[in-house]
């Protein structure tokens, strides 16, 4: 038990503080840097910081859910989603650096809250565990579509990253649904949306 706790603690430290790794090529590989105005660059940077913080939250959420999941298929779905979210961390972290910015200072806070939420979701049972996975991914997909609508058209590098992330999130949601996710009650969806809005507004600037 102690070994497992140490492993999970190490995962948390790596997620928040260590450079993330990716097996897949970066989606923006081979694309040229666009000539962005200072305003466009600041906006793209803010959006990529939001996306990076969102992936930190997703890592913590899925880590907590996997800890308490009972069904092996559910655990595997969560682990697969978590690994691809790690790749998203690597992609967004690199893009943030290219745009001359830094990651959100609030990442440790959001990680802790998301981990607690994931553990709670897992304790409710696998169907609700999967419901949280499905709804989280659909909400992330929606906000990535919003980002694609406001990112500068000429910022091909950021747009390629966000597009691949969106496609991955959609696939994760479909997997959760196919595995038997429960129907998430509207009030819970609303609370998740409000929490997401708070994360986006704060991490865009801080």
From Swiss-Prot:
<dbReference type="GO" id="GO:0005886">
    <property type="term" value="C:plasma membrane"/>
</dbReference>
<protein>
    <recommendedName>
        <fullName>3-demethoxyubiquinol 3-hydroxylase</fullName>
        <ecNumber>1.14.99.60</ecNumber>
    </recommendedName>
</protein>
<dbReference type="InterPro" id="IPR012347">
    <property type="entry name" value="Ferritin-like"/>
</dbReference>
<feature type="binding site">
    <location>
        <position position="169"/>
    </location>
    <ligand>
        <name>Fe cation 2</name>
    </ligand>
</feature>
<comment type="pathway">
    <text>Cofactor biosynthesis; ubiquinone biosynthesis.</text>
</comment>
<dbReference type="GO" id="GO:0008682">
    <property type="term" value="F:3-demethoxyubiquinol 3-hydroxylase activity"/>
</dbReference>
<feature type="binding site">
    <location>
        <position position="85"/>
    </location>
    <ligand>
        <name>Fe cation 1</name>
    </ligand>
</feature>
<keyword id="KW-0560">Oxidoreductase</keyword>
<keyword id="KW-0472">Membrane</keyword>
<keyword id="KW-0408">Iron</keyword>
<keyword id="KW-0831">Ubiquinone biosynthesis</keyword>
<keyword id="KW-0479">Metal-binding</keyword>
<dbReference type="GO" id="GO:0046872">
    <property type="term" value="F:metal ion binding"/>
</dbReference>
<dbReference type="InterPro" id="IPR009078">
    <property type="entry name" value="Ferritin-like_SF"/>
</dbReference>
<feature type="binding site">
    <location>
        <position position="88"/>
    </location>
    <ligand>
        <name>Fe cation 1</name>
    </ligand>
</feature>
<feature type="binding site">
    <location>
        <position position="55"/>
    </location>
    <ligand>
        <name>Fe cation 1</name>
    </ligand>
</feature>
<feature type="binding site">
    <location>
        <position position="169"/>
    </location>
    <ligand>
        <name>Fe cation 1</name>
    </ligand>
</feature>
<dbReference type="GO" id="GO:0006744">
    <property type="term" value="P:ubiquinone biosynthetic process"/>
</dbReference>
<dbReference type="InterPro" id="IPR047809">
    <property type="entry name" value="COQ7_proteobact"/>
</dbReference>
<keyword id="KW-0503">Monooxygenase</keyword>
<keyword id="KW-1003">Cell membrane</keyword>
<comment type="similarity">
    <text>Belongs to the COQ7 family.</text>
</comment>
<feature type="binding site">
    <location>
        <position position="172"/>
    </location>
    <ligand>
        <name>Fe cation 2</name>
    </ligand>
</feature>
<comment type="function">
    <text>Catalyzes the hydroxylation of 2-nonaprenyl-3-methyl-6-methoxy-1,4-benzoquinol during ubiquinone biosynthesis.</text>
</comment>
<feature type="binding site">
    <location>
        <position position="85"/>
    </location>
    <ligand>
        <name>Fe cation 2</name>
    </ligand>
</feature>
<feature type="binding site">
    <location>
        <position position="137"/>
    </location>
    <ligand>
        <name>Fe cation 2</name>
    </ligand>
</feature>
<dbReference type="Pfam" id="PF03232">
    <property type="entry name" value="COQ7"/>
</dbReference>
<dbReference type="InterPro" id="IPR011566">
    <property type="entry name" value="Ubq_synth_Coq7"/>
</dbReference>
